Regions:
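Ligand-binding loop in jelly-roll beta-barrel domains
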Residues: 114-142
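Residue-identity detector for glycine
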Residues: 4-7, 11
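Conserved short histidine dyad/triad with adjacent acidic residue
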Residues: 48, 63-79
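A short, N-terminal "cap"/entry segment at the start of jelly-roll beta-barrel domains
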Residues: 11-59, 147-149, 154-187
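Glycine- and acidic-residue-biased ligand/ion/polar-headgroup-sensing regions
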Residues: 80-83, 87-94, 98
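Short acidic-glycine-tyrosine-enriched beta hairpin
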Residues: 99-114
Length: 187
């Protein structure tokens, strides 16, 4: 997908095409009301809304986060096999990534590849609210979110009932030989 401002040549063509297509679904990121998430711990108390399902998306996602000062979208993490994009709509959030931290500005776009190179945390260290949009691929039926700071892995599937969060350092020695054997015998 190509991202651009409506005033740019590429952005204008894409923007016009989407708005004039009868089957396209449109929403204004600045006009969305984000729902409070008071159950989240301090440091992650954000308002948010998942827009992808609302617009009928089945293989991609879009969530909008309103970050009060001192709050983050979530813990430092990366995903497998998902890719993500971040668009700063307003404010100046701070992005933590594998090479350090940097302050972002409105209209900044950041791409996070799947895997450790795409690890990130978005926090609002400013004294004013910030709004960001996160786009993600979501065609996989099984995946994992790895939280390096807490040594946790969230394994998700198409069935929420079998999703789980586990410690990466947990040992499952009794099953390891079976997995190795399975990988060698199946082609």
């Amino acid at each position: 997908m190509i991202f651009g401002r409506p005033g740019s040549l590429v952005g204008a063509a894409l923007y016009k095409e989407i708005l004039m297509t009868d089957s396209a679904r449109r929403i204004n990121l600045g006009a969305i009301d984000c729902a409070p998430r008071p159950h989240l711990p301090d440091g992650f108390r954000r308002n948010s809304v998942r827009i992808g399902p609302t617009l009928g998306a089945e293989r991609s996602g879009l969530s909008v986060y309103e970050l009060p000062p001192g709050q983050a979208v979530g813990p430092y993490h990366y995903e497998e096999p998902e890719e993500e994009w971040l668009l700063v709509v307003s404010g100046t959030p701070t992005l933590r990534h594998p090479e350090g931290e940097e302050r972002l500005e409105p209209w900044d776009i950041v791409f996070f590849p799947a895997g450790p190179a795409g690890a990130h945390l978005v926090r609002n260290n400013s004294d004013k609210s910030a709004r960001v949009a996160m786009f993600s691929s979501s065609g996989a039926t099984v995946g994992a979110v790895v939280y390096p700071d807490s040594d946790l892995v969230w394994v998700w599937t198409a069935d929420d009932a079998v999703d789980m969060v586990v410690k990466r350092s947990s040992k499952v020695d009794d099953i390891a030989p079976w997995i190795a054997d399975r990988n060698e015998t199946e082609t």
